[in-house]
Amino acid sequence: MRWDLITAIVAALVVSVLADESGQMAPYRIHTLFSVECQNYFDWQTVGLMHSFLKSGQPGPITRLLSCTDDQKKTYRGMNLAPTFEVPSWSRHPKTGDWYPAINKPVGVLYWLQHSEEAKHVDWVVILDADMIIRGPIIPWELGAERGRPFAAHYGYLVGCDNLLVRLHTKHPELCDKVGGLLAMHIDDLRVLAPLWLSKTEDVRQDTAHWTTNLTGDIYGKGWISEMYGYSFGAAEAGLKHKINDDLMIYPGYVPREGVEPVLMHYGLPFSIGNWSFTKLDHHEDNIVYDCNRLFPEPPYPREVKIMEPDPSKRRGLILSLECMNTLNEGLILRHAENGCPKPKWTKYLSFLKSKTFMELTRPKLLAPGSVHILPDQHEPPPIDEFKGTYPKIHTLFSTECTTYFDWQTVGFMHSFRQSGQPGNITRLLSCTDEALKNYKGHDLAPTHYVPSMSRHPLTGDWYPAINKPAAVVHWLHHTNIDAEYVVILDADMILRGPITPWEFKAARGRPVSTPYDYLIGCDNDLARLHTRNPEACDKVGGVIIMHIEDLRKFAMYWLLKTQEVRADKEHYGKELTGDIYESGWISEMYGYSFGAAELNLRHSINKEIMIYPGYVPEPGADYRVFHYGLEFKVGNWSFDKANWRNTDLINKCWAKFPDPPSPSAVHQTDNDLRQRDLLSIECGQKLNEALFLHHKRRNCPEPGSESTEKISVSRKVGNIETKQTQGSDETKESSGSSESEGRFSTLKLWVIALWLISGVGFLVVMLLVFSTRRGRGTTRGKGYRNKRRTSYSNTGFLDTK
């Protein structure tokens, strides 16, 4: 009796242990998750995964997280393919409208945690992809997973964990692990990680400026692996450091490590055996789950593989590929039977799938104790001089108008931006009248924030398009949600050569960085004393601006107000005060910037090695980040002046471009300064034409030289074009509202006459204002005068700072 009791107790203990280790009792309850959508493509993958789940002996329940729209559910046939938890579809992002189905994975996991009753009774979670075949039980603690230390497979191509990308998206770049595919973690860790996984996926997906292959490892540069980075960056934010393995999950077609038996196959990549091959993307719309007795093309048999491949290691890899394909087909056979399909006819292949040989090949693979190989920490040490803190987010702005003149500049700017590695997002501030917007064709040229045009001032009627820059910045600040810490403000007529970052150029809150505009002599004379309380704080800067967002919020309105103030002060347009050789007030916006910053005592760090004008001799050793082609520049007989292309549509005419600059071999060989100057000028010209070429290619223009393009080339006869444009330059500059040389050909008298012709009433009002102002001031202006002038602009619609 005593022995019977002992035997019963031992048996109970054994059963208890086995139950624990099978994932059925706390604290060893395992739950497996995988995410899919309502598509045939995911249905056949689900059949394969579910069949392998049952064959492998994986402990615990499994749940399919099914993301479907309401319309998809109406016609969906696969509800019975797996235990299912329905989750909202975010394939089309509910806020941004971005089409990115991969985001459904973190959305589904988070929704399951928040709304599933099953999630309340789980200790460990294994997360897989649908395109996987399980070969043996995946037990988290056997893999080495602990609370706070998840287990994951190695994804070596996630290079963003080692470069700029990680510093932009997490405060803990040192914790970023290149992992994915196979994930096993404690439920408590998943609860912390899941919302971060989703939010970081959204962040990376929206950071289109950093989808480039060199930063992400994505060969397509389309941001498709944003969800993978969302996981790694989210885990880093959560403080989770993974135990990483590189041999338990294998891609069919790869050779397994000697002595290692993979427990998971991931058939995300094409694989082949002899003349047979399989690519999952070839079956994107495949109805194979619902077509009775139809299978994927049968692969070779094991004995054929043994004949064709003498190398034992490679042969073992091919056998794994066979197993993957055969398991998929075996699952389809069983699914067809459940669907009520007639019994299939006998074939040699069906006979093999039911054979003892195949059963032995697919017997569950169990991990040997101590066989799990954990990789050492593979983070690359940062360079000694690299910024040690967390990189702040950056947003780049540039201002344009609804004209083809700004459109070709935008094309050049955006092309260079994508190549430069500039961090963060970018926004074009597009100032348009309602009428111009109706006919505008360049909406797709850049991420755009639309701004009401102030080219014609709403109160004074003054024509001054340059005011759109500060007005647009004010509008952007008041009408968008901005999560960037720093803003980089550039001009459209620029070409980026490299990143412009606050950490490299030492910008800080209260200390913006800019480039020198030495011709702003008004900072040193009466002009500054007339327009700012702090003339000693006036910096002669412009072009490139790096500023903290909080500084910009305080400063932007001053920039706009001071621009209006200087523009209205026509008495002081003289070049001896402003440095403007045309004496037209055209650089009022530049002074508006400097005087506005001075009002706040916002002093700049001035860096002369960020920007260069093509045609200028570079400083020795300077690594310029920006070309500013606002002035004419030449190399030999070739020249470029942006003003000559004001009325030429280079964007909507296929293959239109600028005259090609000379070859670099044609530049000065003896004088190194002149050689470097010319090489930079050539680079700028080449970059503009390169941008135009790619633009026309994206627009699907017919091949150059075809009949449809012969008559639209604008750059075949360089001499003729330059001659025609030179002859018409006076008319062009006089008729264009945004011409930078308006003042050269328009005296104050002509302006008054033109205004009178437009509106006699307006003329009388303006003259009354002018005369009343002259009676009320002497040769100098006091603080009261300035305050009065500011008040006169308080109803522009841009002064609401709430």
Curated annotation (Swiss-Prot):
Predominant localisation class: endoplasmic reticulum
Membrane topology summary: Single-pass type I membrane protein
Pfam families: HPAT
EC number of this enzyme: 2.4.1.-
Residues that span the membrane, as ranges: 751-771
Molecular function in Gene Ontology: glycosyltransferase activity
UniProt function note: Glycosyltransferase involved in the O-galactosylation of several proteins including extensins. Catalyzes the transfer of alpha-galactosyl to Ser residues. Hydroxylation of proline residues adjacent to the serine acceptor is required for activity.
Designated name of the protein: Peptidyl serine alpha-galactosyltransferase
Organism: Arabidopsis thaliana (Mouse-ear cress)
